[in-house]
């Protein structure tokens, strides 16, 4: 979570521990997205039921992956402080570039992606817009509709946890977006 915001674990609120299942993943925090390792924190009676369900849905992660995960879980606060500092700098770099281009967007308060508002281009489909963006501008994006239950076709998601050079190149390409993608 970026300053000045502060994360509050729901289970720490009064009366919520016994009624909360916290699900999380190691994938993004430790840059191991392909491993698909996660965990839950819950009262013991819920953990017992979850273990039974888990046995029927999946097999355990390979031992080397589990050992690597334990290493990550033992990192001290400095790891997370450094990660937050790096992501804050990348967010600020990318947001400034988008502001300079004049594209409407969200300002993430804890994520490492930005949602761009593409409504000015008049596309009926965010998926089609993403195809055109990749083909004509050279920037990959994920359709925003992938993340909403409601029909939302005016948002796309761009990821900024990349090398600064990659972000500058993406911003350079996006600076020509209005020339390369005609309004409909």
State what each model feature region is.
Residues 1-184:
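PLP-dependent class I/II
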């Amino acid at each position: 979570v970026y300053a000045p915001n502060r994360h509050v674990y729901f289970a720490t609120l009064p009366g919520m521990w016994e009624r909360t299942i916290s699900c999380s993943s190691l994938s993004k925090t430790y840059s191991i997205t392909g491993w698909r390792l996660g965990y839950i924190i819950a009262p013991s009676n819920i953990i017992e039921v979850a273990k039974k369900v888990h046995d029927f849905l999946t097999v355990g992660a390979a031992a080397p992956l589990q050992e690597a995960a334990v290493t990550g879980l033992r990192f001290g606060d400095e790891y997370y402080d450094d990660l937050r500092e790096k992501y804050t700098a990348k967010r600020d770099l990318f947001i400034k570039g988008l502001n300079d281009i004049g594209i409407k967007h969200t300002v993430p308060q804890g994520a490492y992606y930005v949602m761009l508002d593409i409504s000015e281009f008049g596309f009926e489909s965010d998926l089609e817009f993403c195809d055109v963006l990749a083909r004509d501008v050279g920037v990959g994006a994920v359709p925003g509709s992938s993340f909403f239950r409601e029909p939302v076709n005016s948002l796309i998601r761009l990821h900024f946890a990349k090398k600064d050079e990659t972000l500058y190149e993406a911003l350079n390409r996006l600076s020509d977006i209005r020339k390369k993608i005609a309004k409909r």
